[in-house]
UniProtKB/Swiss-Prot annotation:
Catalytic-site annotation from UniProt: S466 (proton acceptor)
Annotated Gene3D superfamilies: IlvD/EDD C-terminal domain-like (3.50.30.80)
Cofactor binding note of this UniProt entry: Binds 1 [2Fe-2S] cluster per subunit. This cluster acts as a Lewis acid cofactor.
A Pfam match: ILV_EDD_C
Name used for this protein in its record: Dihydroxy-acid dehydratase
Keyword Aminoacyl-tRNA synthetase recorded: no
Function description: Functions in the biosynthesis of branched-chain amino acids. Catalyzes the dehydration of (2R,3R)-2,3-dihydroxy-3-methylpentanoate (2,3-dihydroxy-3-methylvalerate) into 2-oxo-3-methylpentanoate (2-oxo-3-methylvalerate) and of (2R)-2,3-dihydroxy-3-methylbutanoate (2,3-dihydroxyisovalerate) into 2-oxo-3-methylbutanoate (2-oxoisovalerate), the penultimate precursor to L-isoleucine and L-valine, respectively.
Organism: Methanococcus maripaludis (strain C7 / ATCC BAA-1331)
Pathway given in the UniProt record: Amino-acid biosynthesis; L-isoleucine biosynthesis; L-isoleucine from 2-oxobutanoate: step 3/4; Amino-acid biosynthesis; L-valine biosynthesis; L-valine from pyruvate: step 3/4
GN (gene name): ilvD
Enzyme Commission code(s) on record: 4.2.1.9
SUPFAM superfamilies recorded: IlvD/EDD N-terminal domain-like, LeuD/IlvD-like
Keywords: 2Fe-2S, Amino-acid biosynthesis, Branched-chain amino acid biosynthesis, Iron, Iron-sulfur, Lyase, Magnesium, Metal-binding
MF (Gene Ontology): 2 iron, 2 sulfur cluster binding; dihydroxy-acid dehydratase activity; magnesium ion binding
Subunit structure comment from the entry: Homodimer.
């Protein structure tokens, strides 16, 4: 065992003494050491309940003959960080989490890990760190939040973000907005729709890294405690059998995750996180081109918020990810999982599917997959749109650019009534390096939707979007403005041509004009001169490469 390097032999007497100071016995030190990676925090609703899950995991580890050691990572709430400088730290925190998991597990000689994340960057960050070690690990995600209810209708956090736009145009009163605020988030869990946190939980299960149904069991459900305990027991088996993550995470496993993502219409942020996870196995193992290629294999089969009327609780009650795998079994590759059964065996074991929520492939919500990669002179390396959450009338759109060099400028313009039907809002210098940190543009997109402009106004950016964004929002434009991408050359009034069916995005300018404009631009000056974001800005790769540190 790896932990023998910490605990075996006369020379390790000082090491054992320190462990005994923590309450561990000689008997404990004969067993596999299992790191239990928690991300509990009192700031994030998706993480406020994770102490209960970590205790359940540790019970499972003990019961099956392992010795658990709990430690924590950070966890940032994108919703609380949204709309201000704090959002610049959200995506970069993924790399801090990965480094923390790698450092703690390697330094203390753990034989296996149980990862307990919930929210957006914490899920991929923990997986990335664990993959660097290539020791057995299982993920038990914290689970979705239940939706709230306002005046007889379900609501959740995005209802509030869009409510701000509705208030600005007089659709609702401040009192009504306050009433929604009181009930939109009723308790623990990740936000109730298929936003980034829940998208990543679903893809983690599809990758084979979580036990079946884990992704959709809700935070307040006792089933979550039971599956946490089962996960703790299972990791001891994986350590004894030496089942490494690279035995599970084959190219085919990543393709399964992408197929599920495309079929469900997951968050566009998955196109950052899945390549970043794969990059820990092999450089450019998975790229945007894989998302593009696989989008031809599956339709959009589930109408879940923000692209539909259902919530995560509906997906769970419809059969969860095993049911999705069952519906897609003609496309799914047969791969290993931490459960011990193969992906197709799990799919075949499903006894019930609600086809009103998880549609059959022959009767989908949309014929096209839920995510789409666009390329053209505006984004030679690609950009991404959640087409499953776009009004079909906006699949093709030509319009004049309204250009803003930050999210803050754009929000002021939107709320100030400076955007009219037909416009294409361009928000630039918000990419991984330029932002820095690639902020999510949920505030502007929600304002557009709340004001009723989402079927007539498009938004493109080298930043990214919340999983809760809907409408014709095209993000991750690569190369970014700070790297001299074409988006830096766009001027007010330039015609932007968007064709989501043809997978194209272009600015209607001759190449010579683009080159001339780019040649006249001043060299990009980093916005932040010290601290973590300064280092991040210098080291981060492009969005089309997963925004990983070089």
């Amino acid at each position: 065992m790896i932990s023998d390097n910490v605990k075996k032999g006369v020379i390790r007497s000082p090491n054992r003494a320190l462990l005994k100071a923590c309450g561990y016995s000689d008997e404990d030190m004969e067993k596999p050491f299992i790191g239990v990676v928690n991300s509990f925090t009192e700031v994030v609703p998706g993480h406020i309940h994770l102490k209960t899950l970590s205790e359940a995991v540790k019970h499972g580890v003990y019961a099956n003959g392992g010795t658990p050691f709990e430690f924590n990572t950070i966890g940032i709430c994108d919703g609380i960080a949204m709309g201000h400088e704090g959002m610049k730290y959200s995506l970069p925190s993924r790399e801090i989490i990965a480094d923390a998991v790698e450092s703690m597990a390697r330094a203390h000689g753990f034989d296996g890990l149980v990862l307990i994340p919930t929210c957006d960057k914490i899920v991929p960050g923990m997986i990335m760190g664990a993959l660097r070690l290539n020791i057995p690990f299982i993920v038990v995600t914290g689970g979705p939040m239940l939706p709230g209810e306002f005046q007889g209708k379900k609501c959740e956090l995005i209802s509030l973000f869009e409510g701000v736009g509705e208030y600005q145009v007089g659709k609702i009163t401040e009192e009504e907005l306050k009433s929604i605020e009181e009930c939109a988030c009723p308790g623990a869990g990740s936000c109730a729709g298929l936003y980034t946190a829940n998208s990543m939980a679903c893809l983690t299960e599809a990758l084979g890294l979580s036990l079946p149904m884990c992704a959709t069991i809700h935070a307040v459900d006792a089933q979550k405690v039971r599956i946490a305990k089962k996960t703790g027991s299972k990791i001891v088996d994986l350590v004894k059998e030496d089942v490494k993550p690279t035995d599970i995470l084959t190219k085919e496993a990543f393709e399964n995750a992408i197929l599920v993502d495309l079929a469900l219409g997951g968050s566009t942020n998955t196109t950052l996180h899945i390549p970043a996870i794969a990059n820990e196995i092999e450089n450019k193992f998975i790229t945007l081109d894989d998302f593009d290629r696989l989008s031809n294999e599956v339709p959009h089969i589930a109408s879940i918020k923000p692209g539909g009327e259902h919530y995560m609780i509906d997906l769970h009650n419809a059969g969860g990810i095993p049911a999705v795998l069952n519906v897609l079994k003609g496309k799914i590759r047969d791969t290993k999982t931490v459960d011990g059964r193969s992906t197709l065996e799990i799919a075949e074991s499903v006894k019930y599917i609600n086809y009103d929520v998880i549609r059959k492939v022959e009767a989908p919500v949309h014929e096209t997959a839920g995510l789409r990669v666009l390329k053209g002179n505006l984004a030679p390396n690609g950009c991404v749109v959640k087409i499953g959450a776009v009004n079909p009338k906006m699949y093709k759109h030509d319009g004049p650019a309204k250009v803003y060099n930050s999210e803050d400028e754009a929000i002021s313009a939107i709320l100030g009534g400076k955007i009219v039907e037909g416009d294409v809002i361009v928000i630039r210098y918000e990419g991984p390096s330029g932002g820095p940190g690639m902020r999510e543009m949920l505030s502007p997109t929600s304002a557009i939707c709340g004001m009723g402009l989402d079927d007539s106004v498009a938004l493109i950016t080298d930043g990214r979007f919340s999983g809760g964004s809907r409408g014709p929002c095209i993000g991750h434009v690569s190369p970014e403005a700070a790297a001299g991408g074409v988006i830096a050359a766009i001027e007010n009034g330039d015609i932007i041509k968007i064709d989501m069916i043809g997978k194209e995005i272009n600015v209607d300018l001759d190449e010579s004009v683009i080159k001339e404009r780019l040649s006249k631009l001043d060299e990009f000056e980093p916005k932040i001169k010290k601290g973590y974001l300064s280092r991040y800005s210098r080291l981060v790769s492009s969005a089309d490469e997963g925004a990983v540190l070089k």
